A protein has these predicted regions:
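Conserved S-adenosyl-L-methionine
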Residues: 29-85
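Short, polar loop motifs at secondary-structure junctions
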Residues: 38-42, 143, 224-227
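Short, well-ordered beta-strand micro-motif
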Residues: 110, 262-265
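Flexible, glycine-/basic-rich loop-and-beta segments that form/coincide
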Residues: 267-272
C-alpha cells in the first residue's frame, strides 16, 4: 500500500525523518518490517512495505488503539462521533475508563486530538493528566480508514523492545526510535506509561543491534546527539547527524533546531 500519514499526533514522532528514511531505503530489498518503539508509527506509514511485520510498544492504550483501528476502524469512528469537543466534555471523557476495546480506542484518539500539544501522559497511578488544548479538534476519519487498511496483516503487540530478537531473520528491516537517555542521572522518563528508559536500556538496545546485524537484517536507529550515545553505539554502524524542529513543549524557549544521531547498517550505496 502507498505511503500515508499517521492518524495520531505523538511527542517525539518521526514524521520529520520520513524523507531521509525514504532516501536511505530506496532500492533496498528487505523482507519484514519491525518498529519496537512504535509511537505514532510515522515511518511505518510512510513506507510501501513489500511484506508484513510487527509494530510494538510498551504503552498498552496505544497498542489497543492501533489494534482497534486495524480490526474495525468504522466501529472506532462510531464511538468517536458520540464525543463533544468542548472543554467541559473533554474533562468528563478524560475521567472515564471504558473497558471495551473500541471504546478505549475512541477515548484514546479523542484525548490525543483534543489534549494540549497532542501529548499522551499519565501519572504514576496510571491516570491520564494532560489538560485540554484544542477547541473543536477532531480526528481525521479518512486518515483513520486509510490506516486501518495499511495495518491489515500487521502484528501489533505490547511488549519490551528486545522481544523482537527471536523473530528477526535475514533481510528484515528494523526501525528503532528509543526514548532519549544520556546518563544515569538524566534517566528518560517515559511519561506516557509511567516507566523509565534508563542508560542500561540503551546498552540493551546496543545488544539488540548486535543481534540484528548477526541475523543479516537491516536497522535504522534515531537517538540523542550526545557523547554518551556515540560511545555506546560507535561500532554499530555508520552515523549521521540531522537536525529537527522541536515542536513539543510548553515554553517557546525550548522550541528550535535540535540535532539527533541516526545510526544504520544499510550500505551507503543504497542512498543517493
Amino acid at each position: 500500500m502507498a505511503p500515508i500519514t499517521s492518524f495520531i499526533r505523538w511527542a517525539g514522532g518521526k514524521s520529520w525523518l520520513v524523507p531521509y528514511v525514504a532516501q536511505l531505503t530506496e532500492g533496498l530489498d528487505y523482507n519484514n518490517y519491525y518498529e519496537p518503539f512504535m509511537g505514532g508509527a510515522s515511518i511505518f506509514f510512510s513506507l510501501d512495505l513489500p511484506n508484513k511485520g510487527c509494530l510494538s510498544d510498551i504503552n498498552d492504550e496505544l497498542i489497543n488503539a492501533f489494534c482497534a483501528v486495524r480490526d474495525n476502524p468504522e466501529r472506532v469512528i462510531r464511538y468517536l462521533k458520540e464525543y463533544e469537543t468542548d472543554e467541559e466534555s473533554y474533562y468528563v471523557i478524560r475521567a472515564t475508563e471504558p473497558k471495551g476495546k473500541y471504546q478505549r480506542a475512541a477515548r484514546f484518539l479523542y484525548l490525543n486530538a483534543n489534549s494540549f500539544n497532542g501529548l499522551y501522559r499519565v501519572n504514576r497511578n496510571g491516570k491520564y493528566n494532560v489538560p485540554y488544548g484544542h477547541k473543536n479538534a477532531t480526528v481525521n476519519y479518512t486518515r483513520l480508514l486509510e490506516a486501518g487498511k495499511k495495518l491489515e496483516g500487521m502484528e501489533i503487540v505490547c511488549h519490551d523492545f528486545s522481544d523482537i530478537s527471536t523473530k528477526i531473520v535475514a533481510g528484515d528491516l528494523i526501525f528503532l526510535d528509543p526514548p532519549y537517555t544520556v546518563s544515569k542521572e538524566d534517566t528518560g522518563f517515559v511519561g506516557y506509561n509511567s516507566t523509565w528508559f534508563s542508560l542500561d536500556d540503551q546498552h540493551r538496545l546496543a545488544k539488540l543491534i548486535d543481534q540484528i546485524k548477526k541475523a543479516g537484517a537491516y536497522y535504522i536507529m534515531t537517538n540523542a546527539a550526545h557523547e554518551t550515545i556515540l560511545e555506546i553505539f560507535k561500532d554499530k554502524g555508520r552515523m549521521v547527524t540531522l537536525e529537527r524542529n522541536s515542536l513539543i513543549g510548553g515554553k517557546k524557549a525550548y522550541r528550535g533546531k535540535v540535532p539527533e544521531y541516526i545510526f544504520t547498517n544499510i550500505p551507503e550505496r543504497s542512498t543517493k
